[in-house]
């Protein structure tokens, strides 16, 4: 029995128990052997936050043959099942943050230590990097991101559609005013021309198939990547719908495309594929819950044996101390496991599965940039001391951030129609900017949020909490009225890479668990104390970004008087009609609106990717140079950051790394040959073929089949069950399949043919036969196959039926031909009646085949033509083969002319099946 849901002071932790396992449960499961296979972990993902969850989910969904196990280790607890803004307003955001050692003047708070991490409370802004922002990125990687992975990640987080939850007169008027203002370059010289920007994702990715892993987890197919077809052209009518225009609107196509570029690229899915609920604002937790549910469903129960069948386990509240490595003879470093400390402060080692078939297990570091770097340094400071470790922690980059909040009269919005509408409305817009500094373009953008057109009432805070992208701006937005609109222009700008004043090192002063914590130093550009060449560029970039905010603010004010909110000291500063950008800057100087560097929590770069091991830390797939199997899946990989939030790019890289691990690194099922000529596969070892099979058996019996490593493996200790191919019945056929037993003393199973649908009531004659033998078909419909079809037996022990009488003796003796491997079960085969000296009747012509040997694949060829049955048994290793039985059916009630095919799960007798073919 597994750990039950625990009672806290206020709640019953059913969701945490559903999602998570204890460390002991995970370690115990790894010691179990299932179908002759050890069940150690093939991939250990360190970090259950945003990118760890994405990576692990992708690994799970990519595994088409169910061949590997994934373990997620998270130091924080489980707190929320989805993004905080998808839930009722509770007056704030979750704050399970843990600080790290840092430069004393910067005061970092740390990231969310919880399953889902930053994705539980982020703002959702997800613009894509421009081509020019991929500074120092490997070209092959950039090409793959643009050709495939940005589309996939956009679909996954919900940024590939327009924001149809942000609409209304306010939004339309603000967008039009901004569009008109940016149309004159002199008005906003720091803005990039809309014509020079790529189309909105809703246009770029229109018509492309869904890649969202939530849909895949719900049964929409495997997670394997497929080529992306060219996007069809979006019609003018569709553009009008995306923009909220009337069908009669005459705006030109080029203007509509440019207007869409001003739409905020928010990770909010309000519409989904048919049959799938939208997830609203993206968080990695719902997807993790989906795959955890799938893993639990596959396991068929609770407890150690069931946990061993689980392909994914999540263990929270576990601190990873370091990664265990060994240096090979070729000087490459291989990871063999991880060392952790459990909730009882006991250190334990979780080993990785050993190499198999030329492939190996892997560890994926998926923490935030700071903690990923700490773990990498603590692990590799010696083994990679003269190599990648000497660069780890350098290239720390984050974002420059400023906030300008203004309140304008609604009369400033020249295209806002007169209306009696009084609903509280919100708007979200996006402007990209750049400035050429030191001979190179430096990029930034504005995230524009607005609210207004109604007086705020007692529920307005809760309403705005749901409507605005950034909950940090909630207080500012509460200044909106029915006569005024509040607008916050948040500037986000890139920092220059490879700044020697920005780095992470292991703290010389502070340690936890005898291991140094991360000490963070980030160039202090805000106060100007850092004067490196990179910092001086960043100062100019920050000025240009703030200048763009002023330019856009003046566009919105449209010559009307307005207020600056939350200026120095929290004051409100009135601005006169006709104010200029120079006057705005004088009234609210740039330094007064700037946040400290790093407060965006967009830290990145410290384990950056590159093709040259001498100048980077990881390769283009995130593997740490000179290691064989240690990967990173986090923004720490970014060579440069650009201005976008790292979410979209981080998700894309996580998917790409998971795809590589699936295709080229992790252990997998042995590749099987294609079906023989003329045969079609009923089960070919893939998830797609497994979905066509259905289980019949006693409810909640725990007797079933696990799909593992491309095989169907029986398990359980209850009444037998039946797994059958559901889509089709068969008349005359040649069925070929392979099976393997594991215990010579317990190897009972069988192959059923020509039986009726077990979910449909049998004809009276068969129901009466079942009743006569004391069988309740309603309690276990698997018995339907016994009475309506025929079973080709698997049991070299030929165990007798304890409930059967054999010519006056009970129980039935062991060893009868009619109960032996290769026989049609229970059809008389001329067996000796030892107590009478006579023989049973001989209805089937049975001859024993080659012995069934544990661990050896045996093959059945079952040929059925009309009422004629012929079975051949072959030892696939020795080649020994024998026709074991020939049988002509004369029972008109059994063996329907068109029947189903299935395999049996017998109590306490594990048997594996593969390559189930038919012609």
Across the structure, where does each feature detected by a protein language model lie?
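Extreme N-terminal leader/targeting segments of oxidoreductases
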Residues: 1-42, 61-67, 663, 667-670
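Conserved redox-cofactor binding core of oxidoreductases
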Residues: 2-9, 141-320, 326, 335, ...
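N-terminal Rossmann-fold NAD(P) dinucleotide-binding loop
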Residues: 52
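Glycine-rich loop(s) and the adjacent beta-strand/alpha-helix scaffold that form part
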Residues: 60-88, 323-328, 339-431, 634, ...
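Redox-cofactor-proximal catalytic regions of oxidoreductases
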Residues: 82-85, 90-186, 217, 490, ...
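A glycine-rich dinucleotide-binding beta-alpha-beta segment and adjacent secondary-structure elements
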Residues: 315-316, 321-324, 544-639
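FAD cofactor-binding and catalytic pocket of flavoenzymes
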Residues: 389-392, 398-543, 600-605, 615, ...
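Carbohydrate-interacting regions of secretory-pathway proteins
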Residues: 671-919
């Amino acid at each position: 029995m597994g750990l039950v849901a625990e009672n806290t002071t206020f709640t019953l932790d059913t969701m945490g128990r559903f999602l998570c396992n204890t460390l002991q449960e995970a370690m115990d499961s790894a010691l179990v052997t299932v179908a002759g296979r050890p069940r150690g972990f093939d991939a250990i993902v360190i970090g259950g936050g945003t990118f760890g969850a994405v990576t692990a989910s992708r690994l799970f969904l990519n595994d088409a043959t169910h061949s590997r196990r994934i373990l997620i280790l998270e130091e924080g607890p489980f707190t929320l099942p989805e993004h905080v803004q998808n839930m009722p307003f509770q007056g704030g955001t979750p704050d399970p943050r843990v600080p790290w050692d840092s430069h004393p003047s910067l005061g970092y708070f740390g990231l969310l230590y919880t399953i889902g991490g930053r994705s539980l409370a982020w703002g959702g802004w997800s613009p894509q990097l421009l081509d020019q922002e991929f500074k120092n990125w490997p070209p092959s990687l950039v090409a793959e991101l643009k050709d495939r992975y940005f589309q996939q990640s956009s679909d996954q987080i919900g940024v590939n559609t327009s924001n149809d939850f942000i609409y209304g007169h306010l939004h339309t008027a603000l967008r039009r005013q901004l569009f008109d203002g940016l149309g004159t370059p002199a008005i906003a010289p720091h803005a990039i021309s809309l014509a020079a920007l790529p189309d909105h994702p809703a246009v770029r990715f229109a018509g492309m198939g869904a890649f969202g892993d939530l849909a895949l987890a719900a049964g929409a197919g495997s997670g394997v990547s497929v080529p992306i077809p060219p996007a069809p052209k979006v019609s003018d009518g569709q553009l009008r719908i995306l923009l909220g225009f009337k069908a009669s609107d005459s705006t030109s196509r080029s203007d509509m495309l440019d207007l869409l570029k001003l739409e905020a690229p928010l990770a909010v899915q309000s519409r989904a594929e048919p049959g799938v609920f939208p997830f609203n604002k993206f968080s990695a937790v719902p997807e993790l819950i989906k795959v955890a549910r799938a893993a639990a469903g596959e396991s068929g129960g609770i407890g150690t044996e069931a946990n061993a069948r689980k392909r994914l386990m999540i263990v929270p509240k576990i601190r990873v101390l370091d990664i265990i490595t060994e240096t090979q003879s070729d000087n490459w470093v291989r990871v063999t496991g991880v060392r952790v400390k459990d909730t009882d402060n006991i250190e334990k080692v979780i080993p990785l599965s050993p190499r198999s078939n030329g492939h190996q297990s892997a560890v994926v570091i998926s923490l935030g940039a700071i903690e990923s770097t700490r773990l990498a340094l603590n692990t590799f400071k010696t083994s990679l001391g003269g190599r990648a470790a000497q660069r780890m922690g350098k290239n720390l980059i984050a974002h420059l951030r400023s906030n300008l909040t203004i309140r304008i009269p609604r009369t400033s919005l020249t295209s806002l129609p007169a209306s009696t509408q009084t609903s509280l409305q919100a708007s979200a817009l996006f402007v990209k900017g750049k400035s050429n500094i030191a001979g190179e373009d430096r990029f930034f953008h504005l995230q524009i949020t607005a609210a207004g057109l109604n007086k705020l009432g007692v529920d307005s805070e809760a309403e705005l909490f749901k409507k605005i992208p950034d909950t940090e701006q909630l207080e500012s937005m509460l200044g909106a009225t029915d006569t005024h609109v509040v607008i916050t222009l948040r500037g986000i700008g890139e920092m220059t890479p490879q700044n020697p004043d920005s780095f992470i090192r292991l703290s010389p002063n502070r340690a936890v668990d005898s291991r140094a914590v991360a000490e963070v130093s980030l160039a202090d550009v805000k106060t100007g104390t850092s004067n490196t060449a990179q910092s001086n560029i960043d100062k100019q970039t920050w000025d240009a970004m703030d200048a763009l905010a002023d330019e856009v603010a003046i566009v919105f004010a449209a010559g009307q008087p307005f207020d600056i909110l939350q200026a120095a000291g929290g004051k409100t500063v009135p601005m006169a009609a006709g104010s200029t950008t120079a006057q705005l800057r004088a009234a609210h100087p740039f330094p007064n609106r700037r946040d400290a560097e790093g407060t965006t929590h967009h830290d990145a770069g410290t384990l950056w990717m590159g093709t040259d091991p001498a100048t980077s830390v990881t390769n283009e797939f995130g593997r740490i140079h000179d290691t064989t199997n240690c990967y990173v899946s986090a923004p720490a990989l970014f060579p440069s950051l650009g201005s976008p939030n790292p979410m979209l790019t981080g998700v894309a890289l996580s998917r790409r790394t998971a795809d590589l691990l699936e295709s080229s690194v992790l252990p997998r099922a042995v590749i099987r040959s294609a079906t023989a000529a003329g045969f079609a596969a009923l089960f070919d070892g893939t998830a797609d073929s497994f979905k066509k099979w259905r289980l019949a058996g006693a409810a909640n019996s725990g007797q079933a089949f696990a799909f593992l490593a491309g095989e169907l493996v029986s398990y359980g200790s209850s009444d037998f069950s039946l797994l059958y191919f559901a889509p089709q019945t068969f008349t005359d056929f040649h069925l070929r399949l392979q099976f393997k037993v594991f215990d010579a003393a317990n190897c009972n199973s069988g192959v059923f043919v020509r039986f009726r649908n077990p979910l449909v009531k049998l004809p009276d004659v068969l129901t009466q036969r079942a009743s006569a033998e004391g069988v309740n078909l309603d309690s276990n419909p698997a018995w339907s196959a016994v009475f309506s079809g025929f079973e080709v037996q698997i049991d070299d022990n030929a165990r007798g039926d304890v409930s059967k009488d054999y010519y006056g003796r009970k129980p039935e003796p062991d060893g009868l031909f009619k109960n032996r491997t290769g026989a049609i079960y229970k059809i008389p085969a001329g067996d000796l009646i030892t107590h009478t000296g006579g023989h049973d009747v001989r209805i089937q012509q049975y001859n024993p085949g080659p012995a069934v040997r544990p661990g050896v694949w045996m093959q059945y060829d079952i040929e059925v033509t009309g009422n004629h049955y012929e079975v051949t048994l072959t030892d696939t290793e020795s080649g020994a083969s024998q026709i074991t039985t020939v049988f002509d059916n004369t029972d008109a009630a059994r063996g329907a002319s068109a029947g189903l095919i299935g395999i049996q799960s017998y109590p306490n007798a594990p048997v594996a099946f593969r390559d189930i073919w038919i012609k």
